[in-house]
A protein has these predicted regions:
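Alpha-helical bundle segments that constitute or directly flank the non-heme di-iron/ferroxidase center
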Residues: 2-33, 93-118
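Structural signal for well-ordered, non-membrane alpha-helices
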Residues: 20-23, 27, 50-57, 108, ...
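Preference for long, well-ordered alpha-helical segments
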Residues: 96, 103-144
Length: 144
C-alpha cells in the first residue's frame, strides 16, 4: 500500500464514506421522525444502503488500499443540523427528506463522475447497483 492514493482509490474511499454517512444519517433522521410518530421509510432506505458497505470495502481492498470510516464528529454535526431543520420546519418530514435527498445527490454525483468502472466489470456492476439504489431512494423520498 502506497502512502499516496490514486484517483481510483480516493474515489472508492469517498464513495464508501458517503455510503456510510448517508445510511447513518437516514437512520438518525428516521429515529427523529419516529419519536414524533411520523410515518417514514428512512429505516428501510438505510438498511438497503448499508448492504453496499461491504461491497465497496472490497473494492477499496481490490484497488490496494484500506477502507476507513467517516469522521464521527462530522456525522454528529450533520445529524444535529438535520434535527434543527426538522425542529424549525413547517413540514418536518418533508424537511428531513429534502436533507436526505441533498446528501444522496452528493453521492450520486460521485458515483456518476468517477472512473472506477474502467478498472473492472465487477466494480462497474457495483457502481450501477448503487446508482439504482440512489434512484430508488430519490423516487421514494420525492414521492415519485
Amino acid at each position: 500500500m502506497s502512502i499516496i492514493r490514486t484517483d481510483a482509490q480516493a474515489d472508492a474511499l469517498e464513495i464508501l464514506k458517503l455510503i456510510i454517512q448517508t445510511a447513518d444519517f437516514y437512520r438518525a433522521m428516521g429515529e427523529q421522525l419516529s419519536a414524533e410518530n411520523i410515518q417514514h421509510s428512512l429505516f428501510a432506505i438505510a438498511d438497503e444502503r448499508e448492504t453496499f458497505i461491504e461491497s465497496f470495502q472490497h473494492v477499496i481492498k481490490e484497488l490496494g488500499d484500506l477502507p476507513s470510516t467517516p469522521d464521527a464528529d462530522r456525522e454528529w454535526i450533520e445529524e444535529i443540523g438535520g434535527k434543527l431543520t426538522q425542529l424549525f420546519a413547517d413540514n418536518p418530514k418533508r424537511a428531513i427528506e429534502n436533507k436526505c435527498l441533498e446528501k444522496d445527490e452528493i453521492l450520486a454525483n460521485l458515483v456518476n463522475t468517477n472512473t472506477l468502472g474502467e478498472h473492472s466489470a465487477d466494480i462497474k456492476r457495483r457502481l450501477e447497483a448503487l446508482n439504482v439504489n440512489l434512484k430508488r431512494s430519490k423516487a421514494i423520498l420525492s414521492g415519485e
